[in-house]
Amino acid sequence: MDSDLKAKVESCARTADTFTRLYYASVDNRRQQIGRLYLDNATLSWNGNGAIGRQMIESYFQELPSSNHQLNTLDAQPIVDQAVSNQLAYLIMASGSVKFADQQLRKFQQTFIVTAENDKWKVVSDCYRMQEV
């Protein structure tokens, strides 16, 4: 692997770890601040329900019951420059367990596309799915 690609992959892995820690802490404990992690025109698909734009996404999260996520797996890949208009972007895939208030523990998987905006990582696209047992 050439040194430039290796540096991109290592940066991607660090970013995925840092971003997902912040993201799930926000979803579980500071949901009123979740909008700051999304671009203004971001898209969310949450177990078949959709929201477009930061304001709609913030409203959607406010309607969800309280939660506690435990992350079990994390994978991330840099997205090639040509696919995202030469903008730095990463594909982050996470899975684990979640307990929503008054519900049983369930498995979930989530896929993000994130990009850098003013030195902050922001969600471009977010797809969250509960796993049926």
Curated annotation (Swiss-Prot):
UniProt note on tissues of expression: Expressed in female gonads (at protein level).
Phenotypic consequence of gene deletion: RNAi-mediated knockdown in the germline increases transposon expression.
Chief localisation class: nucleus
Places the protein is found: Nucleus; Nucleus envelope
Annotated keywords: mRNA transport, Nucleus, Protein transport, Transport
GO cellular component terms, semicolon-separated: cytoplasm; nuclear envelope; nuclear pore central transport channel; nucleoplasm; nucleus; transcription repressor complex
PROSITE patterns xref list: NTF2_DOMAIN
Domain NTF2, chain residue ranges per copy: 15-130
Magnesium keyword on record: no
Subunit structure: Forms a complex with RanGAP, Nup358/RanBP2 and sbr/Nxf1. In the ovaries, part of a complex composed of at least Panx, nxf2, piwi and Nxt1. The complex is knowns as Panx-induced cotranscriptional silencing (PICTS) complex, Panx-nxf2-dependent TAP/p15 silencing (Pandas complex), SFiNX (silencing factor interacting nuclear export variant) or piwi-Panx-nxf2-p15 (PPNP) complex. Interacts with nxf2 (via NTF2 domain); the interaction is direct and prevents Nxt1 binding to nucleoporins. Interacts with sbr/nxf1. Interacts with Nup54 and Nup58.
Protein name: NTF2-related export protein
Organism expressing this protein natively: Drosophila melanogaster
